[in-house]
Every structure is written in C-alpha cells, then in structure tokens.
C-alpha cells in the first residue's frame, strides 16, 4: 500500500476559466519507481490530480481509478481541492480522511484571499509529514488500527469459543445419556461421589 502523491490544487472556475488551475502545494513519494521513471511518473500524476480536481463538484469526495492508481479527491469549496494519489490496495477510507484533514489544515493556515490570489506554489511543509506518516495506513488511521486489533482479538476469541463448544458438546452428550439412565445409575453416581470425596480427605 502506497501513497504516491499529495496535491493541494486551486481549480479554475468552470464558467470564467479564471484564475487558471494552480498546484498550490505538492508532495511525492516515488521511491518505488526507478530514478529514470520518477519525473515522468510525477508529471503524469500531477496531470491526473489537476484533471480530477477540476472535474469534482464542490463538497464532493470521490475516488477515480486510472490504470494502477487511484486519485481520491475532496473539493472543500470552489477554490480548493486536495488529491491523494495511491495504489489500488490503499484503503479508501484512509485516503479520503487524509484529503479532508489536509484541506481543513490548509484552510486554517491560508485565507480565501490568499488562495485566490496565489500566483505560484505556497509553503505548506505539513504535506511532506503527511505523505511519510500515511505510508502505513494502519498506523496513521486510528480507526484502522483499532479495527486490526479487534480482528486479532476476534480471531483469538473464535479459537477460545470453538474450544469451549467442543467441551460443551461432550457435556451435552453426557447430559443426554444421563436422561437415559435409571435411578439405579443415579444412586451409583452419588455413591461414587461420596467415595471420591472420602479418598480426597485421606
């Protein structure tokens, strides 16, 4: 599971086509590609991210698959989209959560006027931290972390319950047999119980 790119994008207005689409901040994690492929891959992912950012409605969250990649986009308002580009195995819930988190944090740091008036990339170092942290979605997302722990506990509990059921089945078969036993057998059980308790005392 990999996060390849995080992009904060100001999409152009569809009606006026102004201001032009601008990548405000970008972080890449392309170590899984060869050195010679990285610039082409980054360029393709940037194009992919800007394209889906422009075509996402305000307030919408969605995932778009392109070959081996998925672009998860959240467009918080007309001037801001966040795109998380991952491989297909990456959990959708975590990617959407990350896009939403980045969007909120970016909007706290930059005003609408700063976003609208930007003419080039802006400094947002948190993006590098997020791309490093979210490489392991189970550690980054507390819900997934708790879910994994619950799954592990559930597996242990299933084994324990299965063991109890096996014993329970044996006890049930004994109970069934005891319903078939006569009073004479019950007296034998009581006598044996007394004898065993007598022997334990000695």
Where are these regions (language model features)?
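Acidic, low-complexity cytosolic segments
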Residues: 1-172, 176-202
């Amino acid at each position: 599971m990999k996060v390849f790119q995080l992009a904060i994008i100001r999409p152009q207005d569809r009606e006026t086509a102004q201001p032009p689409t601008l990548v405000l901040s970008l972080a890449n994690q392309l170590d899984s590609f060869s050195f010679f492929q990285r610039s082409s891959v980054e360029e393709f992912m940037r194009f992919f991210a800007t394209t889906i950012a422009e075509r996402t409605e305000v307030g919408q969250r969605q995932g778009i698959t392109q070959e081996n990649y998925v672009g998860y986009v959240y467009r918080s308002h007309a001037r801001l989209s966040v795109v998380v580009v991952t491989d297909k195995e990456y959990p959708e819930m975590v990617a959407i959560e990350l896009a939403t988190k980045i969007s909120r944090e970016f909007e706290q740091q930059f005003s609408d006027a700063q976003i609208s008036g930007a003419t080039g990339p802006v400094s947002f170092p948190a993006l590098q931290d997020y791309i490093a942290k979210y490489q392991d979605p189970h550690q980054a997302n507390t819900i997934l972390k708790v879910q994994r722990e619950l799954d592990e506990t559930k597996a242990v509990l299933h084994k324990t319950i299965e063991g109890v059921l096996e014993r329970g089945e044996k006890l049930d078969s004994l109970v069934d047999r005891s319903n078939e036993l006569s009073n004479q057998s019950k007296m034998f059980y009581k006598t044996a119980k007394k004898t065993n308790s007598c022997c334990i005392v000695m």
